[in-house]
A protein has these predicted regions:
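Solvent-exposed beta-edge/loop recognition patches
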Residues: 110-119, 146-231, 359-382, 386-388
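Short, compositionally stereotyped local motifs that mark structural "simplifiers"
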Residues: 101, 105, 156-159, 165, ...
């Protein structure tokens, strides 16, 4: 960075040589403190061979524009240096006296949307001057050690006008101000505001600090703004690009308080609660119906006796203070629950408006918003809730965790049941971030963080069992096919018992971050139902392009197949298709397809909604217990496929025409059947999930839900412990093997052993074989014989492949699959 100065040189003659001093004044006075001295430069004035005089600057080599003049009074000769550029001081220093002011900050924004519909934190700048100001060259930073970290481009702020800057690392330095409606196109910094508080600096091009603000920790939806007189205060309703006096300002936040003695939890007898100790003028007000307290709620100024299950929600109020925290405790009196407990506190309107009891029959889509979203009700409303979790049920001595969250109904026809499925989500607007807790046994200690979970009534299998749908996913643990982990819990709403629910992982962008460590915001996550594709994150463009290419091109052409392999995880796709087929899911492939991709990963498919698997064919047109799944996929499921490129089933129907994919599919089928898709594994996973149930809790739930009275309606007897799943799967083993053999003209199966010796692994058709570690393979299993198999030897870092046990030296090879085949890859 350089600054412009004007310099005056005073010379005195010494023969043909002139010696002088040059005094340079900074013409951009705002770029340095007022007491900074002029720049002194030593010079020598000399003449050239033509007698022309010029100034030689001895200490700063530079080419200068000058002209000579004579003082008319003294006769002294001067050389005026017209422009001299010298390096400016790059140390940020206070200048102030600026028309550009920082007037409001909101680190956790909820309502001021950017041009993408997102809600990043923002900073408001106000031009208090009488003329428009150009922000070009100004820096807006949170750290003076990086004072040019983010610099504005060419952007004007009109006189007496506001401008917000979004802080989200998107790095947009200049933008034409548009979108004055719901969305707002504005500049974006390359850094984020700190939720815990911090500082912000507006620095001019010459490193002068024009304004700065230190802001406190702010909870979701609040802002920190300046009011008349220069004081900074809290705002419950932010005022982006508006005067701050249009909203109520608060001097401080209401202080936190604690209940004296008894906290929420399980008690054998009634509990007496005494009012909390608070500072003068502070009043604690509470509700006991699940709703959030207000300034009009009853004051907690005398003892409260809790003699039955009660949720107590309290907040502190005082004139001039902003209340941001509600303390919630659920008290259980005389309850005995041996399973984990989820206690949900929610406004009673959730039940009167949405969580309605029905008597069955077809939903009234025109009048009841509780049913699946439709044209009249495009999405389920989400209400704020408080969730408390007791890991050991009534034996818990304290809450394992608690969190503010949101709740909404989910599911379709299963909403007709008394017990309904809901989604619990943690969002910034509720003050919640990631929940760090091992919710699911199979992920314990791996990456225990979640942005929410589902509480399912077991969907369409509501009258059949507790967890068959979950078993269908659990058998895939370790296979690389995504599924939603599960556990059984008991749910209470506002202290009222609602029975056993299936706590389930949520499928969305956050699932990918939890399970793969990939930034959630980089993920495309899609739902494919029939011929409709929607994205819950990212866009549908890549997915639709993938469908168009694979479904619209000849996959027997090698180049096309190679392109397909770059678009989807081909091994994952094969394993996913095999799992759906084995489970015999009739509500697929024209429904319930989920997939995701990221910059690092091609499209991966995810097992979802297996209610109509495991011999449950109720209400699926054209599907029965004897339906051949290959024929079902070829026809596109119950809705058919025809030649439409939006048909999901067509992906398989086209790819299977390629001999390489057919070979991969058959060999993957051998491994999947041997290690994951078999009766023994189904039985083991059913026992694992049944072990999460408690007999007394099951008896209570069954009595409340009256499953026994519903058996005749659906011709299914209730199977709480999943005892029917194993026997069904044992029969399915032989049945599905027969379907595969018939489909591909195979005659039998034989034992194949694949191993490594030294530090390296063997991939079978790109698959890490079960039991492999990061540096070794040792697998033995049954394979369909009569075809070929691709094997690839992969050394770990520092090792080299030294050949196969049969003398072959190529790392990648094809072998005939025969009974007794044994191959070892050697590494050294």
């Amino acid at each position: 960075m350089f600054k412009k100065v004007n310099c005056l040189a005073l010379m005195f003659g010494l023969g043909m040589t002139f010696v002088g001093l040059v005094a340079c004044e900074d013409t951009t006075s705002a770029s340095r403190p007022n007491d900074a001295p002029p720049v002194q430069i030593e010079t020598t004035v000399v003449q050239d061979s033509n007698g022309n005089s010029y100034v030689r600057i001895d200490t700063i080599p530079s080419t200068l524009d000058t002209h000579k003049t004579i003082d008319p009074v003294t006769g002294d000769t001067f050389v005026v240096i017209d422009t001299l550029f010298i390096p400016a001081d790059t140390t940020p220093h206070w200048v102030g006296n600026s028309a550009l002011l920082i007037t409001e900050i909101s680190p956790v924004n909820l309502n001021w949307l950017d041009e993408n519909g997102d809600d990043p934190g923002w900073i408001e700048i106000y031009n208090a001057g009488t003329e428009a100001a150009n922000l070009k060259g100004y820096a807006l930073v949170e750290n003076l050690n990086k004072s040019r970290k983010w610099v504005f481009g060419d952007e004007l702020i009109a006189a007496k006008s506001f401008r917000t800057v979004f802080c989200d690392k998107n790095n947009v330095v200049a933008v034409e101000t548009t979108g004055e409606g719901e969305f707002h196109a504005r500049t974006h910094t390359n850094w984020k505001l700190e939720k815990s508080g911090g500082s912000v600096y507006l620095i001019d091009p010459y490193y002068g600090i024009r304004d700065s603000v230190q802001y406190p920790e702010l909870s979701a939806g609040l802002s920190w703004g300046i009011v008349d007189g220069g004081s900074w205060k809290y705002f419950a309703t932010p005022t982006p690009e508006q005067p701050n006096n249009v909203s109520v300002a608060y001097d401080a936040l209401a202080p936190k308080f604690n209940f004296n003695g008894n906290q929420g939890g399980f008690y054998t007898k009634e509990v007496t609660l005494n009012p909390p100790t608070v500072s003068d003028g502070l009043k604690v007000r509470c509700t006991q119906d699940g709703s959030a307290p207000t300034e009009k709620s009853p004051e907690f100024n005398s003892a409260i006796v809790i003699s039955k299950n009660t949720v107590l929600r309290c907040a502190a109020y005082k004139q001039g203070l902003l209340t941001t925290e509600v303390v919630t405790n659920t008290y259980f009196i005389g309850e005995t629950v041996n399973m984990p407990v989820v206690a949900v506190s929610v406004d009673p309107s959730f039940f009167t408006k949405y969580y309605k009891k029905t008597n069955g029959g077809e939903p009234d889509m025109k009048h009841d918003q509780m049913y699946a979203p439709n044209e009249s009700y495009p999405e389920d409303p989400e209400l704020p809730v408080h969730v408390e979790y007791f890991e050991n049920g009534s034996k818990s001595t304290e809450k394992a965790w608690e969190s503010e969250a949101g709740i909404s109904l989910m599911g379709g026809w299963s909403r007709m049941e008394r017990k309904k499925s809901v989604a619990i989500v943690m969002r910034e607007e509720y003050g919640g971030g990631w929940l760090h807790y091992p919710l699911f046994e199979t992920r314990k200690g791996v990456n225990d963080k979640y942005k929410g979970f589902n509480l399912r009534n077991n969907g369409n299998r509501f009258v059949a069992d507790y967890f068959a749908d979950a078993v269908g996913g659990a058998i895939l643990e370790g296979s690389g096919v995504d599924y939603q982990r599960s556990r059984q819990v008991v749910v209470f709403y506002n202290g009222t018992y609602y029975g056993i629910h299936d706590m389930r992982e949520r499928y969305n962008k956050n699932f990918v971050e939890t399970n793969y460590g990939i930034d959630a915001n980089s993920v495309n996550f899609i739902k494919h139902l029939n011929k409709t594709v929607t994205a819950s994150n990212g866009t549908t463009a890549d997915y639709l392009a993938m469908l168009a290419f694979i479904n619209g091109n000849d996959m027997t052409v090698a180049e096309n197949y190679e392109m397909a392999k770059s678009l989807i995880d081909i091994g994952n796709f094969a394993d996913y298709m095999l799992a759906e087929m084995y489970i015999h899911n009739g509500d697929w492939p024209d429904n319930n397809v989920r997939a995701w991709k990221s910059p690092e990963t091609p499209w991966k498919f995810m097992i979802y909604d297996l209610d109509h698997g495991f011999q449950w064919d109720w209400s699926v047109s054209g599907f029965s217990e004897s339906t051949n799944m290959f024929k079902w996929v070829k026809q596109g499921g119950k809705n058919g496929c025809n030649s439409d490129n939006l048909c999901f089933a067509k992906l398989y129907n086209n790819l299977i025409k390629n001999d390489n994919f057919k070979r991969l599919f058959v060999n993957h089928a051998s491994v999947m059947l041997g290690s994951y898709l078999n009766g023994a594994n189904v039985t083991a996973k059913a026992k694992f999930l049944a072990g999460m149930l408690d007999a007394s809790d099951v008896s209570r739930d069954m009595a409340v839900e009256a499953y026994m009275d519903r058996r005749g309606q659906y011709s299914h007897s209730f199977d709480p412990y999943g005892e029917k799943l194993g026997p069904w799967a044992n029969e399915r083993d032989d049945e599905f093997k027969s379907e595969i053999q018939s489909e591909f003209g195979l005659s039998g199966m034989g034992t194949v052993k694949i191993a490594s010796n030294g530090k390296g692994v063997v991939l079978m058709e790109g698959m890490n074989l079960p039991g492999s570690t990061s540096s070794s393979t040792n697998y033995s299993g049954k394979f369909f014989t009569g075809g070929m198999m691709e094997l690839t030897a992969v050394p770990v870092e520092g090792a080299v492949f030294a050949g196969w046990s049969d003398g072959v030296t190529e790392a990648t090879r094809f072998v005939a699959v025969v009974d007794g085949l044994t191959l070892t890859a050697n590494f050294k």
